[in-house]
Amino acid sequence: MGLDAVIAEIKEKGRHEAETIVNEGSARKDEIMNAAKQEVEKIHLTVRDEVEKNLSHIISQEEAAAHLIVKRQVLNAQKDLMDQVYKQALDKIVSMPESFHEEAITSLLRKAKEEIPKGRVSCAARDEKILKNVLKQSEFSAYTFGSVIDTDGGIIVESDDGQLQVDYSYRTFLNQVWESGLKDASDSLFA
């Protein structure tokens, strides 16, 4: 399963959850609006002249408060959902089969080679065996195994002199993709 398919699956799930949240928020807004209208009716019956002077003001305040409450609830729910989608995406990537991680490490090392042609490569404990096998390939003969690091996956490459380092960990890569696509994802999920 490719990364695009995983992200598409997660987006679809997020879209369905977002619709549910928006519908619940709309129902809550309607409840608040109904309560506000009932309050206005009580005031209207007891102090008609006063209500006529202040009706527009009260309705505006109640609507603004209701909209603010609903908007805050929806935004909080959207943020929670986006955080869940991010975590699910990372978890899904991390749980991919060994062949995926081997392809990813090979691809990331080729990309790092453009910036650091020789150096040490570090990875997660789970990927140590995979990385050592990849480093045996002739195209990566200028690299040595660095160390096991605390990461979800991917690699960190450091030049031999320690002057340069590129972080191609899954989390860093996903953060870059996430930040660049966050608006698109948000628009897609909550449109």
UniProtKB/Swiss-Prot annotation:
It is found in: Cell membrane. It comes from Methanospirillum hungatei JF-1 (strain ATCC 27890 / DSM 864 / NBRC 100397 / JF-1). The gene is atpE1. One of its GO terms (biological process) is proton motive force-driven plasma membrane ATP synthesis. Has multiple subunits with at least A(3), B(3), C, D, E, F, H, I and proteolipid K(x). Keywords: ATP synthesis, Cell membrane, Hydrogen ion transport, Ion transport, Membrane, Transport. InterPro entries: ATPase_E_C, ATPase_V1_Esu. Gene3D superfamilies: ATP synthase, E subunit, C-terminal, F1F0 ATP synthase subunit B, membrane domain. It is a peripheral membrane protein. GO terms for cellular component: plasma membrane; proton-transporting two-sector ATPase complex, catalytic domain. GO terms for molecular function: ATP binding; proton-transporting ATP synthase activity, rotational mechanism; proton-transporting ATPase activity, rotational mechanism. This is A-type ATP synthase subunit E 1. Belongs to the V-ATPase E subunit family. Component of the A-type ATP synthase that produces ATP from ADP in the presence of a proton gradient across the membrane.
